[in-house]
Amino acid sequence: MKRVQNLLVAVGLSPNYHRRTYPSGKKSLVVRFYATLTPGLEDVAAKEVESFGCKVEEIRERRGRIFFSGEKSAIPLLNHFSRTLERLNVLLLRCEVEGLDDIYAAVKGLDFSFVKGKSFAIRSLRVGEHDFTSMDIARVAGQAVIDSFMESYGERLKVNLNQPDVIIRVELVDSELFVGVDTTGDDAMHKRWWRVYNHPAHLNAAIACGMLRIADWKVDESLIDPMCGSGTIPIEAALMVRNVPNLRDFAYKKLCEWELAFEPNEVRLKLYGMEKFRKHLVGAIRNAVNAGVADTIEFRQGDATEMTGEYDVIITNPPYGLRIHRKGAIERLYHSFARAAKRCMNQNSRLVIITAEHRVFANAAEEAGLQCTHERFVKYGGLLTKIMVFMI
């Protein structure tokens, strides 16, 4: 626990730290964080962060960033139990800069005592127009960390670019500089521990969870993904309700020790996954078994355009048809699927999809008699996709 305090003391030396006094008279350390996430899901992630007792201070809409404060226990809790975040950083510094000299001075002014005896690496990001690169930022910031530690402790810190003990994020967005300690690591949170089979176009797990929250799916409602691929949506739905954490190792474990305690909820759910191709169906079942939720998901082989039954919530990530010669096939698929989905819906059912071909699907849904009740753009990789919700 002493190592935890070392990290937080470093935060305490910046203006981004205060102590909160509770009625009992006890004082609790409150830390400022910034998290990165899928652009377009900021409000969804903010609500999730608040459910962990954190206070959201700023939401950067469509920029994939939220800023908030919370107790130090938020570090393991959010890394393991957040469903929609990508990366959690302890915010060391946030300021305006004009160039590389300002970046060097800002970083050099921080206390890096928490890196003592450890290796570190800078991970840099640059957004906007500048006369230097992100590599220049990493070089200058790295030298600033080394110089700061040398002046304070007379030792040279070890640099390890491949497997550092501590990752320091130095990110410049236009003229605003953010410096933080990455508690997640190089692999973002959406890389789930349970995935042993990858569909060639599998859905980002954090986006899948965002869609579940946008759908306002409830535990007693039936849910199907009729084009489930490797099973991401029903698997994440089961893990969310059963309170199963992301069991990966995260970067914070090299800075502090925390015992992960959780009590899974063994509730049985009405979850269904349908997939046209047997290879992917078998892969989805393997993923569900590895996640420990195969007992509550019914997988079946079938065509989404011929789905039957009645479901409260339908959530899916259909093919986008990015190759020109598939455009016609995608239009036919969307029209057939929209009609099939409507047949399986009641007056309270919701159909939630994500696609880059949102105009095509909107037309298909309208022709099928579905009403769009919600839509939002979401940046998925290099694509501008749209999540849409439809009802009868």
From Swiss-Prot:
Pfam family, one: THUMP
Name under which the protein is recorded: tRNA (guanine(6)-N2)-methyltransferase
Source species of the chain: Archaeoglobus fulgidus (strain ATCC 49558 / DSM 4304 / JCM 9628 / NBRC 100126 / VC-16)
Enzymatic reactions: guanosine(6) in tRNA + S-adenosyl-L-methionine = N(2)-methylguanosine(6) in tRNA + S-adenosyl-L-homocysteine + H(+)
Ranges of residues in domain THUMP: 73-183
Biological process (GO), any one: tRNA methylation
Main subcellular localisation: cytoplasm
Entries under InterPro entries matching the protein: DNA_methylase_N6_adenine_CS (IPR002052), RlmKL-like_Mtase (IPR000241), RlmKL-like_Mtase_CS (IPR053943), RlmL_1st (IPR054170), SAM-dependent_MTases_sf (IPR029063), THUMP_dom (IPR004114), tRNA_guanine-N2-MTase (IPR053485)
Localisation: Cytoplasm
